[in-house]
Regions:
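N-terminal glycine-rich FAD/FM-binding segment characteristic of electron-transfer flavoproteins
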Residues: 1-255
Length: 255
């Protein structure tokens, strides 16, 4: 089973985020393999161990994003692809999906594409579904568990009301939740081996895309630091409690 896993180099979510205008500051900020993508890498590795094949990592970003690819390789993935181009600075989820789709098509045929549900730096959650559309693949989202078989993939899908068990013929795309597995730690041997594993670095030209093809067609209306939550107010009901709660909700524009 040949598996493609999408990975992202994100600012360390354990550190305070900084803004650079209307974008999240990335230059000079410590980055990591996005925690959500670790579950995708682990899912790919478990399927490879069960069915054979290869796991190829795909990422888009500046040169420093190679660190995230190497991290995934140290976990056990076989090779990686990084698409890096100055024209991609500030790319949105739509552009990211378009570029990753072109890279996956160029790299060869894959039985399964795996992605995390959403990244910790953007939380849009739209990229994987858009990627499936560009690739023309069926998609199974929010997988809590998965099981591969010859020619099919079956997942237990988390929903608001419980779980659905769904299956799809391959090739397909799936997104995995944080509860799908326990990502393995990279061993020292794995870290050293990752340095020698092949990583292709492509530009837009290598994908036969131009700067016009990746023009961002949407803009951020505004960005700001979220206000800290204020301490709640305790109301002792002396007969006017309901009215005071109603007034509070009206002030908050809830009702």
């Amino acid at each position: 089973m040949n598996i493609a896993v999408c990975v992202k180099h994100s600012p360390d979510p354990n550190l305070p985020g900084e803004l650079d205008g209307e974008r999240l500051k990335r230059e000079g900020v410590q980055g990591v393999l996005d925690p959500g993508d670790e579950f995708g890498v682990e899912a790919g590795l478990q399927l490879k161990e069960a069915h054979g094949g290869e796991v190829t990592l795909f990422s888009m970003g500046p040169a420093v994003a190679l660190e995230a690819v190497r991290r995934g390789l140290s976990m056990g993935a076989d090779k990686g692809v990084l698409v890096s181009d100055d024209a991609l600075a500030g790319a949105d989820a739509l552009t990211t999906a378009r570029v990753l789709a072109a890279a996956i098509r160029k790299a060869g045929d894959f039985d399964l594409v795996i992605a995390g549900v959403e990244s910790t730096d953007g939380y849009t959650g739209t990229m994987p579904s858009t990627l499936a559309e560009f690739l023309g693949l069926p998609q199974l989202t929010y997988a809590k568990s998965l099981e591969g078989a010859e020619g099919t993939i079956k997942v237990t899908r988390q929903t608001a009301d419980g779980y659905h068990v769904v299956a799809s013929p391959l090739p397909a795309l799936i997104t995995v939740t944080a509860g799908v597995n326990e990502p393995r730690y990279a061993s020292f041997k794995g870290i050293m081996a990752a340095k020698k594993k092949p990583v292709e670095q492509w530009s837009l030209g290598d994908l036969e895309l131009s700067a016009e093809d990746v023009t961002v067609n949407q803009s951020v209306a505004g960005v700001g630091v979220a206000e800290e939550r204020k301490a709640g107010e305790v109301i002792e009901d002396d007969g006017t409690g309901a009215a005071r709660i109603a007034d509070f909700l009206k002030e908050a524009k809830v009702i």
